Amino acid sequence: MRTMINTLIAASLSASLVALPVMAEDEKIQLWDKMNEYTVELEDGLLTISRIKTPPALIKGFLQPMVPAEGVTPVGEIDIIEMIGKEDSMLVDMRMKDHVLQLGTIPGSVNIPYTEVAMNMDQFGCAQQGEGWNCDGVTTKVYAFCNSSTCPQSPNGIRAMIREGYPAELIYYYRGGYQDWTIHGLTTVEGEL
């Protein structure tokens, strides 16, 4: 009986190991800018870098640049922790509302989905002027984030803010987003409507 169980376990493990490379090959996901792989030349030959779906890489998207628009400042966890609660700063969760409600958010953040940023520039101190916005004289530092370093939501929201007239030098981009925040075990709060 024990021999039969050991044989079944060995056969099962062998089948898993054989299938693993095939699964990994089928599960390639986008790196950035519509590229699925990137080849670099090293001293001992070519090396191809790719992304495969793993539990930490389940969030859709592709790698975002450290600076999503000229003039924007990239920030990390310590910067976010130190800015929470400051009167001259605003932490904006640019994820869609369902993500915020389902997963939670960073304490002190306000949810303005990236698709709604251009319609809510008054939240950042801009005044509506005709069909556009007047952001002259705004001083609020806006710290924006979304799901992760592969999420295009906050970069798109940041570009919309700049397009509407918000000064890029007052925008800070937390590229790691909610995923990095939770990976580091930092405090989260429930999302609200």
Language-model features, listed with the residues they occupy:
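N-terminal signal peptide c-region/cleavage motif recognized by signal peptidases
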Residues: 19-21
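Catalytic cysteine-centered active loop of the rhodanese-like fold, especially the PTP/DSP P-loop
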Residues: 126-181
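Flexible, polar/low-complexity N-terminal or interdomain linker segments that lie immediately upstream
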Residues: 23-103
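Short, solvent-exposed loop/turn and secondary-structure capping segments
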Residues: 102-105, 124, 155-158, 184-185
